[in-house]
Regions:
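PPIase-associated folding chaperone regions across multiple families
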Residues: 2-60, 68-127, 131-134, 148-151, ...
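Surface-exposed, Lys/Arg-rich phosphate-binding patches that contact polyanionic backbones
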Residues: 135-139
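Short, surface-exposed, charged loop/turn segments at secondary-structure junctions
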Residues: 141-142, 166
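Beta-strand-connecting loops/turns
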Residues: 142-143, 187
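Feature captures eukaryotic membrane-trafficking machinery centered on endolysosomal pathways
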Residues: 145-148, 157-158
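Gly/Pro- and small hydrophobic-enriched strand-loop and loop-to-helix capping segments
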Residues: 155-165
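Short clusters of hydrophobic/aromatic residues that line enzyme substrate/ligand-binding pockets
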Residues: 165-168, 181
Length: 249
């Protein structure tokens, strides 16, 4: 473990407490919590950043008003004060990660760029090859729109969205879909193809390439931070496991 991040378990736990955590698979998350607290202990963030962090949290959890917030707190079994502390903690983690890994963020982005592509596409799935061919020719000849045909014939959930899927990460769906979408042109309609048990007709609506903005930079820094934390936790557990299993003289 890094010299700057040592943990004296005796200051946190009795032997019974340690045993309880291990037996209930909580030890790893416990050590992680201590390490994160140590790492961000000297990080200070402005009131503006705190407010922004809470607003982002509300937005991402679709909390629009006080009533929504009250419901969220009730189902989460936490108080507003506890929620605010957790949001501030996460904001400090992001700030720490940005300060420490800022110079590595672009390299990680370039390595992850392909996986971060977003896509919007239209899809119709049917178990019948003949029907898939008929659908394809109707769209190609503009006899009927893909949206209308999706509602009529698609056997997947996309029938409820008029065939439209996305924006979603291009890697979210079937790997073969991602491969096809990457080589298609905007507006291009695929001929029927077999995907598992489905015959599919697909059209690329939009491919969204990621850009290295501040949000993405923060995401890359946070990913590197998470990896380092996991490595530190695993290293700590391994070393302590070796100590406990070492023969006594």
């Amino acid at each position: 473990m890094d010299k700057g991040y040592t943990i004296d378990l005796n200051s946190f736990l009795t032997n019974d407490g340690l045993k309880f955590l291990i037996e209930n698979n909580l030890f790893k998350s416990f050590i992680k919590s201590i390490l994160v607290a140590k790492m961000i202990s000297e990080v200070e963030i402005s009131d503006e950043l705190k407010t922004q962090a809470f607003q982002n949290f509300m937005l991402s959890n679709k909390i629009k008003n006080e009533n929504d917030l009250k419901k969220f707190l009730e189902i989460s079994y936490i108080t507003q004060s506890e929620l605010e502390k957790d949001v501030i903690k996460q904001a400090k983690v992001i700030e720490f990660a940005k300060r420490k890994y800022n110079n590595k963020a672009n390299t990680r982005f370039l390595a992850r760029r392909k996986d971060m592509e977003m896509v919007v596409y239209s899809l119709i799935r049917t178990s019948s090859h003949e029907l898939a061919k008929e659908i394809y020719f109707k769209i190609e000849s503009e006899e009927e729109s893909l949206e209308e045909l999706a509602i009529k014939y698609s056997e997947g959930n996309e029938k409820y969205s008029r065939g439209i899927i996305g924006p979603v990460p291009i890697t979210q769906g079937h790997p073969n879909l991602a491969d096809k979408l990457r080589v298609m042109q905007k507006g291009e309609l695929s001929e029927p193809f077999l995907l598992d048990k489905w015959w599919c007709v697909m059209r690329l609506e939009k491919l969204i390439n990621p850009s290295f903005n501040e949000i993405v930079k923060s995401q890359m820094c946070k990913e590197i931070f998470d990896e380092e934390i996991n490595n530190l936790v695993n290293s700590f557990i391994q070393k302590n496991s070796n100590k406990n299993s070492a023969p006594t003289k």
